[in-house]
Regions:
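Amphipathic alpha-helical packing segments from all-alpha helical-bundle domains
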Residues: 128-143
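GST-like domain detector, emphasizing the conserved glutathione-binding G-site
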Residues: 1-126
């Protein structure tokens, strides 16, 4: 059975949960708390599975996969009964480009761990402006 290590507030993990449900794949959610003061993802057991110590992380038998886009591609290629991608080009490439825009251009710049670092190292006001700029730029292109 597929096992997804996930945190309920993680948008990256949410992407994978959506795909698993759209594809109607039987899976187990393994909660991994990223909450301050708990930080299960930094524990030795999780670090041994996933040295990056992030969610999502998918296990399929002995195979472990990190990073939401890699997981989505794996699910699409290996569980193709209910495809997520359109059947033809250029639609497939457009969907992939949209996914990459979110996962690579918007999400990393606005990730909570990145924003917390910026707010700690710099003032909150510039960090908030930085966040607003990248969200606006990314979603304007997506629209």
């Amino acid at each position: 059975m597929l096992r997804l290590f996930s945190y309920w507030r993680s948008s990256a993990a949410y992407r994978v949960r959506i795909a698993l449900n759209l594809k109607e794949l039987e899976h187990e959610i393994v909660p991994v708390s990223l909450a301050p003061g708990v930080s299960e993802h930094r524990g030795d057991a999780y670090r041994a599975k996933n040295p990056q110590m992030l969610v999502p992380y998918l296990e399929d038998g002995n195979l472990g996969i990190a990073q939401s886009i890699a997981i989505l591609e794996y699910l699409e290629e290996n569980y193709d009964d209910l495809p997520l991608l359109p059947a033809n080009e250029p639609q497939r490439s457009r969907v992939r480009a949209f996914c990459q825009m979110i996962a690579c251009d918007i999400h990393p710049l606005n990730n909570l761990r990145v924003l917390n670092f910026i707010r700690t190292e710099f003032d909150a006001d510039p960090a908030d402006r930085w966040y607003a700029h990248w969200v606006r730029e990314g979603f304007s292109a997506a629209e």
